[in-house]
Regions:
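Bacterial Sec-dependent N-terminal signal peptides
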Residues: 1-24
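Glycoside hydrolase catalytic-domain context in secreted enzymes
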Residues: 21-779
Length: 779
């Protein structure tokens, strides 16, 4: 009887053998991660620790994310994204959707030992825990598992490999939970320059370094920006980041605003073109990296900000703070602020079509709600979001609040205070409900699910269960769409060694450096003193930085140091500490910084606290300011008039001016070259005549400035902002209107206006100038 048994066994095995033969997938393992190649289909990645198994259907491999043993629509990568997202949203509990609506607070990796972003590992600080830097903190496990958070804001990382390993640990952790929804990790911009870093052709770095947004704008070349987006997206994905909390496309219509440096300047058309290029670069995948419609494994969701434009804060004050909560429109120019969105971010050239997400600003767009006449922050304003963004401009992507908008206000001048402008009297749950009813999908910086589920119950009482369930699923579909399109449901895992080779690789470093060279504006070249001769002797004065506070309100220490890497300078020039021995002086300064327009000491001493934002170094007294502010009022203030008329302010870095004037005197007529790192427009009259040449940069390595000064590269950038003749014109200009200042004219007769710049031949007149520099008619 043995032979028939063998025959039966063999026959029983035949179907399985045939099925294996028909399989279109293969698998390889790298540690705990298995990578699956589907021939003619989407490739997969899953963690052996998550409990997820592979289903074979029609010969293809699929991940059984909810572990029910069958292929659900949302697990089927052959189906359209919207069909998958709707299927998954319908399966999610209210608590799970509420978690998807959260966006974590800032997460350094590893977690900090103290401060607002602190974390622990087995209840110990990292240094005492024995944990790896790539391990999940206790707090991360808590908000991922208990609060169902799937959108994590990653800040500092120790290295690309650690970032990749942390990503894999986080993805494996959530893959094993519930429906297996992956994390959509995000980042604020992280490609800025380190001024003292040295660029070596052919060498890699920690991450490619590019000029700041204003510097990208100063190229007046959208192709440079598109290339930045394309490269940055590859580096982001190698770090496990699939959403960029950028670009910032607000038009910088008030020169005093603290966030001017993050914009593409004051011109709506230039900002729109740069926004389009940036997002096309970030979101578009091509060739084998494309999944569908331009989306794929090199795509990073771009969250364009800040709708409907945050650059019109009264007096230039910023709405991270209660003292800057109002955006005002004395020029009736609200609509022009929408152009970078409607003509740029929502009208892409690439196949992805429009920005994946939008972030409204903290501001109350004062008296702009023509429907409900509400003066509440944009995140709460149904007219601003539902009527304008959603209905008029047909935007159906994710809308995510800026960070901490639902929190309680604690003080007028704290960066970490809640920013519930205009709805301070509502409970936290009521604020969440109002945000949802305004058309917003997601809460930035909120880790706790309870207020969202409370908001759901408020809605059920008001509109019924069916209405609120549909409203939640609507947001869930939008949020899931961005996770599906970037391939995260199929493979959210990285190979750390590949990440190490990708991030900061030589060709990326070179592209960033070339962009830096294209971003430096030459404003002055008296008697064609430039380019300087290499090998001459230079004097570089040390820069004094007084103690102060940064934009986040954190204390910064006093410093006296060289503002540029002197070892780099020595590769171009001989160096001396004695001006008498020098052929040239090279001075590196920063644009004036007088703070944000609020003085806490003034408030404590019985004043209102409001002072002018000063764009010159020396003391400025605001004799020409408005006697009565356009907007005002806060629960923590007993007055509504926020005027600063007659009050004074001095730049914190007034010593920069002294450095120029002192050096000019010490050089006794020998050439003085001034390089300004600019964050805001400034009044040049204080020192222009003491400089033979002036450069402006918006965040570059000092080496790039030296390459321009010595003629290794020719300056080609143009001013993306006007430079005011004085503070009187700053007070006279309207917060909401671009190109409306009298501009400074230097001793060579050149006007420092939008679009001005010099090359070795003189004033630049080219196709960029023809396209963007027009006579502007005031609205």
């Amino acid at each position: 009887m043995a032979k028939p048994i063998k025959l039966i066994t063999l026959l029983a095995l035949l179907p399985a053998t045939a099925a294996i033969a028909q399989n279109k997938w293969t698998e390889r393992k790298a540690g705990d991660i298995a990578f699956v190649t589907n021939t003619g289909g989407q490739n997969l990645g899953y963690a052996s620790t998550s409990g997820v198994k592979i289903l074979t259907v029609d010969g293809f491999a699929f991940k059984d994310l909810n572990k029910n043993g069958k292929l659900d629509k949302y697990e089927d990568w052959r189906l359209p994204v919207d069909e998958r997202a709707k299927d998954l949203a319908s399966k999610m509990s209210v608590e799970q959707i509420a978690g998807l609506m959260l966006y974590s607070r800032h997460q350094p990796i590893p977690a900090a030992a103290g401060g607002p972003f602190a974390g622990t590992y087995n209840n110990k600080v990292f240094a005492e825990s024995g944990a790896k830097a790539s391990d999940l903190s206790d707090q991360q496990k808590q908000f991922l598992a208990k609060d169902n958070v799937r959108h994590v804001l990653v800040t500092s990382v120790q290295s690309p490999e650690i970032a990749a390993q942390w990503n894999n640990n986080a993805q494996a952790f959530v893959e094993g939970l519930g429906l297996g929804i992956p994390n959509n990790n995000s980042s604020d911009p992280r490609h800025g320059t380190v001024a003292t870093a040295e660029y070596n052709a052919g060498a890699g770095g920690a991450i490619s370094m590019w000029p700041g947004s204003l510097g990208l704008a100063a190229t007046f070349d959208p192709e440079v920006v598109k290339n930045f987006g394309h490269i940055a997206a590859q580096e982001y994905r190698a770090l496990g980041i699939s959403t960029a909390l950028s670009p910032q496309v607000d038009i910088a219509t008030d020169p005093r605003w603290a966030r001017v440096s993050g914009t593409f300047g004051e011109d709506p058309q230039l900002a729109a073109d740069m926004a389009r290029a940036y997002i096309d670069g970030f979101q578009t995948s091509a060739a084998e990296k494309e999944i569908k419609n331009g989306w794929g494994y090199n795509s990073v969701n771009a969250m364009v900000k800040h709708w409907p434009g945050g650059g019109a804060g009264e007096g230039g004050r910023d709405a991270h703070y209660a003292y800057g909560k109002y955006a005002v429109y004395p020029g009736s120019n609200f609509n022009q602020h929408l152009i970078p969105f409607t003509e740029g971010a929502f009208k892409l050239n690439g196949k992805t079509g429009m920005a994946a997400a939008v972030m409204p600003y903290y501001t109350i767009s004062y008296n702009q709600d023509v429907k409900n006449h509400e003066n509440v922050a944009n995140n709460y304003n149904s007219y601003i979001i539902n009527d304008l963004l959603r209905k008029k401009y047909k935007y159906d992507g994710v809308v995510c609040t800026d960070w901490l908008v639902t929190g309680d206000e604690t003080t007028v001048d704290s960066f970490l205070s809640g920013k519930s402008w205009g709805v301070e009297g509502l409970s936290i749950a009521q604020r969440h409900y109002k945000v949802l009813m305004a058309g917003v999908d997601q809460f930035g910086g909120n880790n706790e699910v309870a207020p969202v589920t409370e908001a759901y119950q408020i809605g059920v009482k008001e509109h019924g269960e069916a209405f609120m369930r549909a409203r939640f699923e609507q947001s869930a579909v939008r949020l899931l769409r961005n996770i599906f399109r970037t391939g995260l449901f199929e493979n959210p895992y990285l190979e750390p060694e590949v990440s190490k080779q990708t991030v900061g690789k030589p060709e990326f470093m070179d592209a960033g450096y070339q962009a830096q060279l294209k971003s430096i504006v030459m404003l002055k070249n008296k008697a064609n003193i430039l380019p300087l001769q290499s090998g001459k002797t230079v004097y570089v004065p040390k820069k004094f930085t007084p103690a102060g506070r940064n934009f986040l309100g954190m204390e910064t220490p006093e410093k006296l140091e060289y503002p540029v890497n002197m070892e780099t300078v020595k590769k171009y020039f001989k160096v001396t500490d004695n001006p008498d021995e020098a052929d040239y002086a090279l001075i590196f300064i920063a644009s004036p910084n007088s703070g944000g327009g609020y003085n806490s000491a003034d408030a404590k001493n019985g004043g209102t606290g409001y002072v002018p934002v000063n764009l010159q170094y020396g003391t400025y007294t605001a004799t020409d300011a408005r006697a009565t502010s356009i907007a005002g009022g806060d629960p923590l203030e007993k007055f509504t008039n926020r005027t600063y008329k007659g009050k004074s302010s001095t730049a914190i870095n007034i010593t920069d001016l002294a450095m120029v004037t002192d050096t000019y005197a010490k050089m006794k007529g020998k050439p003085v070259i001034v390089s300004v790192n600019m964050s805001n427009p400034m009044v040049f009259s204080e020192f222009e005549k003491d400089a033979n040449a002036i450069f402006v940069d918006f965040g570059v390595q000092g080496q790039a400035s030296l390459d321009i000064m010595t003629g290794k590269a020719e300056p080609s950038a143009l001013l993306p902002l006007q430079m005011p003749i004085d503070m009187k014109t700053v007070e006279a200009q309207f917060e909401d209107v671009p190109h409306d200042m009298k501009c400074y004219v230097d001793e060579n007769g050149n006007k420092y206006d939008f679009g001005f710049g010099l090359n070795w031949k003189g004033v630049i007149k080219d196709a960029r100038v023809d396209k963007y520099v027009k006579s502007v008619v005031k609205p």
